[in-house]
């Protein structure tokens, strides 16, 4: 789990999960406030583990409030189980889906006279293709598409369940963000509230009053 600010300590996943579980069983703790403004993200499996733990915490009847100046996709996955999600007035939620890129070195190796021999057999033996090809093979494209499509389906399912959104709402938001922003005068925050991704827009200085 990574944070942007250098003075923010990186959090061990297991320590975080244990802390949430401990807070659930501590009668002195009424709820959790999560500031995700400097959150850089983590692997999807890690994000889902934290989300699942927060969902379990919420079942205890305690509140969860999540805040961010602007929610990245990773931050929003973690925020999704919250009782209330708050963003800065000029903030909002940025959802992008997943993508994959590779650097290919064959053309460079050809220029310097270096030949790479890849000994492999069968389909989907693509680990060294970036050394022997100039672009991504169909096998590699297909396996990456299948992988990221399945991950994205799980992510959207979790968000839609936690936010009580209709199935397909997240894909609609992502695929139509240009029209959604135009409808809301280019205001990410207002668009995010309209589509029930966040609940309130509050300045950081007003959070305590809120």
Functional labels for PLM-detected ranges:
Residues 86-87, 198-205:
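Short acidic-hydrophobic, aromatic-tinged amphipathic segments that line or gate anion-handling sites
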Residues 1-178, 208:
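Small-residue-centered hinge/linker elements
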Residues 189:
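Short, acidic, Ser/Thr-enriched surface-loop or helix-capping motifs
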